[in-house]
UniProtKB/Swiss-Prot annotation:
Protein species of origin: Rattus norvegicus
Gene name linked to the record: Tdrd7
Residue numbers carrying Phosphoserine: S874
Stated name of the protein: Tudor domain-containing protein 7
Organism classification: Eukaryota, Metazoa, Chordata, Craniata, Vertebrata
Region (Disordered): 320-352, 873-895
Localization, UniProt: Cytoplasm
Length: 1113
């Protein structure tokens, strides 16, 4: 589907969901809330949104409201009406993929257990005002409860209402208390101006007839009075005064508009004013200003033609303005923008005396910002010492001839009164003459505007040489895609960002350039050139590209294509002046530095490797430092696994003469087994030139750190995957490579020269000193991956007994021997016979033959490797893993905090319920709380987490990663329905063991996230006391307010799209307690407050969706 057609269809869907139309300033926001994108009117070739809308009359009907606002309505389309209704109600983020080229990066996140979609400081602030527009809404009614830490609650039960705005301010401090805005004049003033204080939880309800019985009550949504603690005492709202900054900005805008009108004595259409404003002052005119002109008689005169036109005319202000002798100029306040006038006539009401109307008009003249109707009697009595007629207050419509009445939410008893301005004398004309005059004026101004546009188009060819191009903004997404163009060294890599606002926008611009330069006969090649000048170049295949002159010659010039980053010598006949219209897009070619390769950036071998692996290809990029030249890591995501390009290039330039090249049938002695994995894989160190040089460098590094004071420059300030650094273990420094960054505090590393992997704190790592860095990087990893050869096929999966026996026999033994039988270069594995010193070189007495003992391969039921000390259960059993002296694992275990080691429980049986943490705190029925939904199945079953506890859960998971990565292993029995720790995708979770399978897997339930997983039984370990303090965070929930016993897959998917991995507000209806904390259940209403001016009650949305779905079926 073409882009224009897709935009038209989505635009119709948005407009059809608003039967009263959408005002033009809000249309972009409504469109984005449905599609996730803005209306791309510029990409479609239109200078403004209004111009695009007027170009599609089959989709949009544009009218002007009574207040002068431009309102857009959908044009009926019978074939898509029903579909559009369903789409309009499903307000999820459906982002168009566009031209996507491998833009998704499966790189490990820096915070894998840090929740997605964390809310902003304030998810929603109703009434937020821009610089020039003041909120027209009165202060909402606030509900307050003393001493509440999770939310605010009134003395009566509040009903859930889908239109009621929900505010909240989330604080991550553990002991933060809730504050709620009180009834205070200054607070009211700030809230009215859009600078409202931010309470933790603030719900505003409105009456609704179809409410659940326990929540039925009637409280006005737009009541202009504050409700205090006992709901009895009320306080009137005071008038408000805009802040000084607002007044200063408004004065500047008024002066500018006055200057524009002085240049157009014959009038100007209000819809054209933003264009002239931006043309003269290089700034956008705030849309809120367009609604205030009728309140600025000293600036302009507003006239609406009666010939059926939809626009308004603005004239310069008349020299003689009505005098207001009683008005104090020092008390003048800028008026708020007028709301749509809602004149509500009252039939059968008594008329108001003319003298009262005159006094009301005179009184309102003193209040340029308007006066609340409820405050009128007191102001009237204070000024005239006469009581205001009660009938007049009940019948505000009777005052409509002397004042303008702005009703609040359609309530005839709540309104703001404004003084009416006298009409200009030249507007009192006869109908026919006025209509003809309006037509003549409109034609004249349209001709003038067309002439101005024509002159601008002609003057554009005069081309101002000093063209300013906006700088390129680095994408905000986590892993944008880039195209590598070329490089001179690894600190100077030319890239282009791939995406909608980058490469796609450039392609659209180049199409426009081709059309402009190919079809415009007035455009001719440039005659005079100078270095630095911007050009449009007619390149190969009739493409038009932006370029900048680097050097000049007689007939040729050297240019750099600013969107591609390469240079070329071209003839002058192909160079044209660049039209300013093509300078709004930033230059797309930019530079970056490859992280980890800075020290070798000029190495020709490295540059050659990087160039061969990257140039002309698209990669996902992790931006580490968003400086002028960003520091990045490139990832190739085209295959099944993500490949770290930086690390791959670094390994490709290692000194091959320092590698160990194993030969088939060769014997090697003095071999040290450094690591044995749970699948029987071994890592060995074979004596060689590289190992000797590495040991020598590590000794020099130790001496260097010993002699030199350790400063902050040697601490790791910017960890990233693939970075090689040092880790101090058992009194010596070892090389490690960062393999996964969990957070700013914890990460996973692999020992390059022993094959071990573990999790460490960032503070425990050190940078390699610069004097040794280049030599250290040149030495290849010295750990050789091996497998025992010729093992019987019947052995199958390695048992814990077999692994422990092998570790006990050869781990860290430095005088073993191996005989190589096969080398699999593709997998990087050597198949060997392994010998201890006593058995070398008899093949029948090798480790390969000894380990085939049948007793070691009996698969014991419900047995796995645990995190309990081996000596605790069987002191004399050598099958328990005891690491040899000097191993990295032993050093890590010894350095682990004593509090964790002491807390390890030596139980082979299950833990009792008394050892479980207390249940997580939930709000009571009728209260609300901030929650996060980590997983959702359907409205009848989803999981919530209390938002206030998320930070504590993140800290706990960091501690679990650090603890279990260095814990010892032993046999232990497992039982169903008991709590353990389990490793799932490189992270450790608190789990409930649900079932034990016969294939070595167990079914577990994540007690903090609510997910069910299958893991290897060896990855399950006891949950120690330290990790049993925090309550389990996952609480099963059910959506209240919907009646459906079975949910279709389609309905379940819609529900998941709206709630899963999102922060929401939950209004608790029922809490179902249970003895087991994981069996507790809560029935809640969910409210999505992420949209700027709309709260989505999920139960109402799902109910409407089911109704529409049934109609469609």
């Amino acid at each position: 589907m073409l882009e224009a057609d897709l935009v038209s269809k989505m635009l119709r869907a948005v407009l059809q969901s608003h039967k009263n139309g959408i005002v033009l300033p809000r249309l972009q926001g409504e469109y984005r809330s449905l599609t996730g994108d803005w209306i791309p009117f510029k990409q479609l070739g239109y200078p403004t949104l209004e111009a695009y809308l007027r170009s599609v009359p089959a989709v949009v009907r544009i009218e002007a409201s009574r207040s002068g606002e431009i309102v857009c309505y959908a044009v009926a389309c019978t074939e898509t009406a029903r579909i559009a209704q369903l789409v309009a109600r499903q307000r999820t983020s459906k982002r168009k993929t566009g031209r996507q080229i491998n833009c998704q990066m499966r790189v490990k996140k820096t915070m894998p257990f840090f929740l997605e979609g964390k809310p902003k400081a304030t998810l929603r602030q109703p009434g937020f005002a821009s610089d020039y527009s003041i909120s027209k809404k009165p202060n909402p009614t606030l509900l307050r409860e003393k001493g509440s830490t999770l939310g605010a609650k009134a003395d009566v039960d509040m009903p859930p209402y889908p239109d009621a705005p929900v505010q909240r301010h989330v604080s991550m401090s553990a002991n933060s208390s809730v504050t709620v805005l009180r009834s205070h004049p200054e607070a009211s003033k700030l809230q009215f101006m859009g600078y409202s204080p931010k309470p933790h939880c603030l719900l505003l309800f409105s009456p609704k007839s179809s409410l659940p019985a326990p929540f039925q009550t009637h409280i006005s949504r737009a009541c202009p009075k504050e409700v205090n603690d006992n709901l009895n005492q009320t306080v009137e709202k005071p008038n408000v005064t805009p802040p000084a900054s607002y007044t200063n900005k408004m004065d500047e805008v008024q002066n500018r508009i006055k200057e524009i009108l002085d240049k157009h004595n014959n009038g100007i259409w209000i819809s054209k004013l933003p264009h002239f404003y931006k043309e003269f002052y290089k700034e956008d005119l705030n849309q809120g200003v367009l609604q205030q002109f009728e309140h600025w008689p000293h600036i302009c005169t507003v006239e609406k033609p009666c010939g059926g036109g939809q626009d308004l005319l603005l004239y310069p202000a008349k020299r003689e303005q009505p005098l207001r002798s009683d008005q104090d100029p020092e008390k003048e306040r800028p008026p708020p923008p007028p709301a749509p006038r809602q004149e509500v006539p009252s039939k059968g009401s008594p008329a108001v005396m003319p003298d009262v109307k005159e006094k009301v008009a005179e009184l309102l003249g003193k209040y340029s910002s308007g006066l609340w109707a409820s405050a009128l009697p007191k102001a009237f009595e204070d000024m005239y010492k006469v009581k205001f007629p009660e009938d007049a207050l009940k019948n505000l419509a009777s005052l409509s001839d002397v004042c303008t009445i702005n009703y609040i939410s359609g309530n005839t008893q709540k309104a703001i009164l404004y003084a009416k301005l006298p009409l200009p004398t030249d507007k009192i004309l006869k109908d026919e003459a006025q209509a003809q005059g309006d037509f003549d004026i409109k034609s004249m101004i349209e001709q003038e505007y067309l002439q101005i546009e024509k002159n601008m188009a002609e003057s554009a060819d005069d081309f101002v040489e000093d063209i300013t191009v906006p700088p390129l903004v680095i994408p905000t997404e986590a892993s944008p895609s880039v195209l590598v163009v070329e490089l001179s060294n690894t600190n100077d890599v030319v890239i282009r960002y791939v995406g909608k606002d980058y490469s796609a926008a450039q392609e659209l611009m180049e199409d426009e350039m081709k059309e402009y330069y190919s079809r415009n006969p007035r455009v001719t090649p440039i005659q005079t050139v100078h270095v630095g000048q911007l050009l449009a170049v007619n390149a190969e295949e009739d493409a038009w590209l932006r370029a900048q002159i680097i050097s000049t010659d007689e007939n040729k010039i050297k240019v750099c294509y600013v969107d591609y980053g390469f240079c070329e010598n071209i003839e002058k006949s192909k160079a044209y002046r660049l039209n300013p219209r093509f300078c709004s897009l930033s230059f797309q070619a930019t530079k970056c530095k490859l992280a980890g390769l800075e020290i070798l950036n000029d190495d020709p071998n490295l540059v050659k490797v990087v160039e061969s692996l990257t140039c002309g290809k698209i990669f996902a990029v992790e931006i580490l430092d968003k400086s002028d030249i960003p520091l990045v890591v490139l990832y190739d995501t085209s295959g099944e696994d993500d490949i770290n390009i930086n690390a791959t290039c670094l390994k490709a330039i290692c000194d091959r003469s320092l590698e160990v090249h194993l030969q088939v049938d060769a014997m090697y002695t003095n071999v040290k087994v450094t690591n044995i994995c749970s699948d029987g894989t071994l890592y060995c160190q074979v004596p060689c030139k590289g190992l000797n040089k590495l040991n020598d460098l590590l000794h020099k590094t130790e001496d260097y750190f010993h002699c030199k004071h350790m400063t902050s420059e040697y601490f790791i300030s910017l960890p990233f995957c693939g970075k090689i650094c040092l880790f101090h273990c058992k009194g010596k420094w070892l090389r490690v490579e960062i393999t996964n960054v969990h957070s700013s505090r914890a990460l996973d590393v692999q020992f390059l020269d022993s094959g071990n992997s573990t999790s460490v704190k960032v503070s425990e790592l050190r940078e390699i000193p610069p004097r040794f860095l280049q030599e250290m990087l040149a030495i290849p990893p010295q750990a050789i991956k091996c497998c025992l050869a010729d093992l019987p096929q019947s052995i199958g999966m390695w048992t814990p007994d077999a692994v422990l026996w092998l570790r006990d026999s050869v781990l860290n033994c430095s005088d073993c021997s191996i005989k190589v039988t096969k080398v699999d270069e593709a997998r990087g594995v050597a198949y060997v016979y392994l010998f201890t010193p006593k058995n070398f070189p008899d093949p029948h007495r090798s480790i390969n033959r000894q380990i085939t003992n049948a007793d070691l391969w009996k698969h014991q039921k419900d047995v796995f490797l645990s995190a309990v000390s081996a000596a605790a259960s069987s002191p004399g059993n050598r099958n328990a893993s005891t690491p040899a002296p000097g191993s990295p694992a032993e050093s890590l275990r010894k350095s682990h905090p004593e509090v964790l080691r002491k807390s390890v429980l030596d139980h082979t049986s299950s833990f009792s319920l008394e050892e479980l943490p207390p249940p997580v705190h939930l709000s009571k029925s009728g209260e609300h709380m901030d929650v996060y939904v980590p997983v959702a199945c359907h409205p009848g079953h989803f999981v919530i987490q209390p938002w206030q506890e998320i930070h504590k859960l993140e800290v706990l998971m960091e501690e679990m990663i650090l603890y279990y990565s260095v814990s010892e292993e032993r046999h232990i029995a497992v039982e169903r329905d008991q709590v353990y720790a389990a490793k799932v995708e490189n992270k450790w979770y608190r789990v409930l063991l649900k079932g034990i399978l016969t294939n070595g897997l167990v079914s577990v339930y994540e007690l903090d996230y609510g997910k069910h997983e299958l893991v290897n039984i060896r990855k399950v370990q006891p949950l120690v006391d330290v990790f049993r303090k925090l309550p389990f965070q996952a609480v099963t929930a059910q959506l209240a307010g919907v009646k459906c016993s079975q949910w279709s897959e389609e309905a379940s998917m819609v529900f998941r799209n709206h709630v899963e991995k999102k922060p929401l507000v939950a209004l608790v209806q029922t809490v179902i307690e249970h003895a087991n904390p994981w069996d507790r259940k809560v029935v809640v209403y969910l409210v999505d407050t992420s949209l700027p001016d709309t709260d989505t009650w999920i139960h109402d949305f799902m109910s409407q969706y089911l109704v529409e779905l049934s109609k469609a079926n």
